[in-house]
Amino acid sequence: MSDKPLPSSFDSDPEFFEENPWVKLRRRLREEPLIPLGCAATSYALWRAYKSMKAGDSDQLNRMFRYRIYAQAFTLVAVVVGGIYYKSERAQRKELERAMEEKKSQAKRDAWLRELEIRDQEDRDWRERHAAVERAAKEAGMKPKDVSKGLAGESAGNQEGEAKSNVGVLDAVKNLVKEK
């Protein structure tokens, strides 16, 4: 088999890495710089209104509340105009993200199927080996359980110091039959 580990459907594949949240934030700030500007203006107006309220300056307080309303209106207009302006680009980006997600899910599905095929092949190989041992045992007149006991005994015999050349499963079964 290959040196690579079996693929798993739970693996995350860095090949399909999209933009992280910071890159997305930077991109959105470049696309619509007026929205953060409006948010900053609103926050500044609220902060100044708070300072005016603490100082007891009601004229400045009222003026800052009006500026806050203007800044919020500016932010709202920036959101609406930006939404209209970037509508087609957002639709294209959404379609691209959908295609990337579909490609990623297809790749995961393919990896999962490959993993299942490999495991299925290993299972078939094991069953074939097991069937060959059973056939050899039937030919020799032994029960399959006796074969496994005999093989376990032979491996114990090998550990005790019996030096034998490469003995296959069939040879081991034949040797067991000859010994009886």
Curated annotation (Swiss-Prot):
Top-level taxon in the UniProt lineage: Eukaryota
Positions of region (Disordered): 135-165
A biological process from GO: mitochondrial respirasome assembly
Entry's Gene Ontology cellular component terms: mitochondrial membrane
Compositionally biased residues, Basic and acidic residues: 135-148
UniProt-annotated location(s): Mitochondrion membrane
Residue ranges annotated for the HIG1 domain, each copy included: 6-97
Bilayer topology: Multi-pass membrane protein
PROSITE patterns recorded: HIG1
Coiled-coil residue spans: 84-111
Protein family: Belongs to the RCF1 family.
Cited PANTHER family: HIG1 DOMAIN FAMILY MEMBER 1A, HYPOXIA-INDUCBILE GENE 1 HIG1 -RELATED
Record's protein name: Respiratory supercomplex factor 1, mitochondrial
Organismal lineage: Eukaryota, Fungi, Dikarya, Ascomycota, Pezizomycotina
Gene behind this protein: RCF1
